[in-house]
């Protein structure tokens, strides 16, 4: 299917007040294959997701052929010359758009980078797509919007060395964005429907939920850890009849 054919403002209107689901798999895990990612994307759309967030050109191509909802696209590249790894180069921007993304997610943290943020966001706009700056702090959000980002998200909160104390959704950062009057997308460690609703109460335009829905290994581990913890307390076990 081609990218969603709509004006940029209309595309955002379709996402406002809704949930996007991030369909990704860690390298080496059983679901790490374009066909599996596409099936995952179809499944979450059937469940009510208004859009999907997809990593990698091959996965983007497969998902674009499978769903007709907006796609947030990115490429993760670990490099030795920068800590920035979400769509770090202009070539990555080109690849993400060519593979069918409607919105391009770009690491917009203040860490040393290979390409100027303004040039990255301009490259997205020149191809009639929207850009999302993934940030970890209020100042980074401001800088991303000033550089031309169409959206900012809390994606990187808790994933930089200066914001690594996050254990749940970045509610504090969301409150800062709201007080500053900056529209934002909530993403990162949203594990429950109640946390999802709280993001909207704090002013999120839309939310992105990932591992709580699309990582069976992580979901299973949460259950297994609780079961193991209970099993370690034999005095709480019921006697079999």
Named regions from a protein language model:
Residues 1-11, 26-31, 35, 170-241:
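Alpha/beta catalytic cores of nucleotide-metabolism and tRNA/nucleoside-modifying enzymes
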Residues 2-94, 98, 127, 136-146:
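Conserved N-terminal beta1-alpha1 strand-loop-helix module at the mouth
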Residues 17-23, 52, 71-75, 104-106, ...:
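Hydrophobic faces of well-ordered beta-strands that scaffold small-molecule active sites
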Residues 24-26, 46, 75-79, 99-113, ...:
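Glycine-rich phosphate-binding active-site loops on the catalytic face of alpha/beta enzymes
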Residues 30-34, 53-72, 83-89, 108-124, ...:
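Active-site-adjacent beta->alpha loops and helix N-cap segments on the catalytic face
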Residues 42-48, 102-104, 123-128, 178-180, ...:
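Short, surface-exposed connector motifs at secondary-structure boundaries
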Residues 72, 76-90, 101-103, 132-138, ...:
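Short, basic, helix/turn surface patches
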Residues 149-156, 167-174, 182:
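Alpha-helical membrane segments in multi-pass integral membrane proteins
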